Design a protein with these regions (language model features):
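Conserved beta-strand/loop scaffold segments within soluble protein domains that form the structured core
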Residues: 1-212, 228-256
Length: 256
């Protein structure tokens, strides 16, 4: 099953699109989605994609976006299922002062495989991108993340940031990260940071001294990473569906 989607945000518009790819837990098959987005001057687009397909699914997800002057594109990606998932995203920040904000959360288990390739092309002046990746690897899961920030000639004053936080729950997981920062302009800044591994020993000791077992600490920290991405989804009904699948209950909300 292959689908194509085109989103055209007119000048000054504000659009939120939610795509929830799901199936029965035991389902198998192949699915592919290509999403192309144009964000006109002063427009805003938020794309939320949630992948919770069955254990036998191979899924291909491709996103291509182009931003014009002072436009903003934001994407929230949650990968929670599927046997093999291939995620690709390319954003051309063409217009001056345009921005990209990407939040990715993934939870991989068994022998699930996730291959991600995210590209931010800084073309216009004073463009900005922020790519934030949070993930949990269990059992014998395999993850590859490629993140490229391309600061091109003419993109004066551009700023690109990329941050990854990966919690390794078991000894047999495979984690691969390939950050790339390309620079063809002087007055620009590109940064990459990563926290990969197990929980800090001092924190683990502190929580264990408060009565938690090591397994409970790891489960709590794993949940916190994914929850932080889920909470960014603006649609409460979508958040509830994801929380019900992961935790068996809806999102807990607290009144001010």
């Amino acid at each position: 099953d292959v689908n194509a989607v085109y989103i055209d945000a007119d000048e000054g518009s504000d659009i939120i699109v939610v795509m929830d790819f799901r199936s029965a837990a035991e389902a198998a098959g192949f699915a592919a989605v290509q999403t192309k987005i144009r964000v006109a001057k002063d427009a805003r687009v938020l794309l939320v994609q949630i992948q919770r397909l069955g254990q036998g699914f191979r899924f291909l997800n491709d996103v291509a976006a182009k931003t014009e002057e002072s436009a903003g594109f934001e994407q929230i990606e949650l990968i929670l299922g599927g046997a093999d998932t291939y995620q690709g995203s390319r954003t051309d920040l063409v217009g001056a002062h345009s921005t990209l904000k990407t939040d990715i959360g993934y939870l991989l288990k068994n022998e699930e495989h996730l291959d991600m390739n995210y590209i931010a092309n800084h073309i216009g002046r004073k463009t900005e991108c922020a790519i934030d990746v949070k993930g949990v690897l269990r059992d014998e899961a395999h993850k590859l993340f490629r993140g490229t920030i391309d600061l091109r000639k003419g993109a004066k004053g551009a700023l690109g940031n990329e941050l990854e936080d990966v919690l390794l729950m078991d000894d047999h997981v495979i984690n691969q990260t390939i950050p790339v920062i390309l620079c063809d302009e002087e007055d620009v800044e590109g940064n990459h940071g990563a926290t990969i591994g197990r929980i800090d020993e001092a924190l683990l000791f502190y929580l264990e001294s408060r009565g938690m077992s090591q397994a409970e600490v790891y489960e709590m920290m794993a949940g916190a990473r994914i929850d932080s991405v889920i909470h960014k989804i603006p649609d409460a009904a979508t958040r509830d569906r994801v929380f019900e699948e992961l935790k068996g209950h809806k999102e807990e909300r607290y009144d001010d």
